[in-house]
Amino acid sequence: MDTTVKIDARDVNFWYGDFHALKGISMEIEEKSVVAFIGPSGCGKSTFLRLFNRMNDLIPATRLTGEIRIDGENIYDKGVQVDELRKNVGMVFQRPNPFPKSIFENVAYGLRVNGVKDNAFIRQRVEETLKGAALWDEVKDKLKESAFALSGGQQQRLCIARAMAVSPSVLLMDEPASALDPISTAKVEELIHELKERYTIVIVTHNMQQAARVSDKTAFFYMGQMVEFGDTKKIFTNPEKEATQNYITGRFG
């Protein structure tokens, strides 16, 4: 089967001030696959994830060396428009963060900000993305109600729909289910399975069972280094590195 490299990171180093947070990381992520980043707190996995849509640009005194290419383009080149990059690379955060707007306007927000004025198109896109986020049947009769009236799990699926509305090709998820109950978590995981038919998904998770359930490949990070990266089944059943084995068996973390 032909596979296309969607994200190509080459010898990435990253600093917060003098702190060397990521050390020499190289990785290829295939199109329409799910890759999970695991590792103990502070190991660099969320920092690396946020480099893919330049979220770390918002933090002062940071520095990056190496290259990150998406669809062959170095996203840190001077000519790259960060707004366009973030349309293509959507982000879903740890805690649901709906805007203080209606359910409908939460999803429509990105379209309006990007200058879409065709209300019929906006209505169609809102319906499509709410269906895509497995939320439409639950909210179709209350689109004008506040997003804050939704449960935590529904709010997180709304945030996924909001990220999808501007037609990205990559979805980044930073601990997307850590604040949710088990039933809501299962719905988000089921959704991730469905979404990979259309998107490349990179997920950071502390939940190793979740990584094993949803991802095709897993990367284990420790102290700013990527210790091991490979097929998820192999990482969890027969890792090559002792540190990976120790982490997944709970000897540290």
UniProtKB/Swiss-Prot annotation:
| A Gene Ontology biological process term | phosphate ion transmembrane transport
InterPro entries under this entry? AAA+_ATPase, ABC_transporter-like_ATP-bd, ABC_transporter-like_CS, P-loop_NTPase, PstB-like
Q: Where in the cell is it found?
A: Cell inner membrane
User: Its catalytic activity?
Assistant: phosphate(out) + ATP + H2O = ADP + 2 phosphate(in) + H(+)
One of the record's GO molecular function terms: ATP hydrolysis activity
Q: Which UniProt keywords apply?
A: ATP-binding, Cell inner membrane, Cell membrane, Membrane, Nucleotide-binding, Phosphate transport, Translocase, Transport
Role, per record: Part of the ABC transporter complex PstSACB involved in phosphate import. Responsible for energy coupling to the transport system.
**Protein name from the UniProt record:** Phosphate import ATP-binding protein PstB
Lineage of origin: Bacteria, Pseudomonadati, Bacteroidota, Bacteroidia, Bacteroidales
State the gene name recorded for this protein.
Answer: pstB
